[in-house]
Amino acid sequence: MSIGVPIKVLHEAEGHIITCETITGEVYRGKLIEAEDNMNCQMTQITVTYRDGRTANLENVYIRGSKIRFLILPDMLKNAPMFKKQTGKGLGGTAGRGKAAILRAQARGRGRGGPPGGGRGTGGPPGAPGGSGGRGAWQGGPTGGRGRGGL
């Protein structure tokens, strides 16, 4: 499974100044050294603002991804290549259409939505493509089926 666009953008922010707020309310602002796929962030030259308003300077900090409430990334990342419309082979015209288009494409691949008949031999006369008179190989049709023989 590939990583999503937000995580790709987070990786693009490595080496830039970001702001990170944790679920405890502390705000860390500094240079992002490394970001992992689970959003763990390693930062340097940090200015931390605590919930009560006090500030402190830290040299290095490592923040667990599940403890991050949100991140503020540089505006220059709006032009990152991940936000460009993807075109080309393999996309089949479903780029940016969401989960519904994916499910539709998968259903088409399984033979749904087409003309009736075909499939497991449940329709059509014997000898027709996909047809065996209603009896498939697994039901004792003309092609066998658990030792019962044909018709």
From Swiss-Prot:
It holds the Pfam family LSM. The keyword Aminoacyl-tRNA synthetase does not apply. The keyword Nucleus applies. InterPro entries: LSm4/Sm_D1/D3, LSM_dom_sf, Sm, Sm_dom_euk/arc, SmD3. Sequence repeats lie at residues 108-109, 110-111, 112-113. Keywords: Cytoplasm, Methylation, mRNA processing, mRNA splicing, Nucleus, Repeat, Ribonucleoprotein, Spliceosome. Residues 5-77 form the Sm domain. It is found in: Nucleus; Cytoplasm, Cytosol. Methylated on arginine residues by Art5 and Art7; methylation is not required for assembly and biogenesis of snRNPs. Its main location: nucleus. Plays a role in pre-mRNA splicing as a core component of the spliceosomal U1, U2, U4 and U5 small nuclear ribonucleoproteins (snRNPs), the building blocks of the spliceosome. This is Small nuclear ribonucleoprotein Sm D3. It comes from Drosophila melanogaster (Fruit fly). The gene is SmD3.
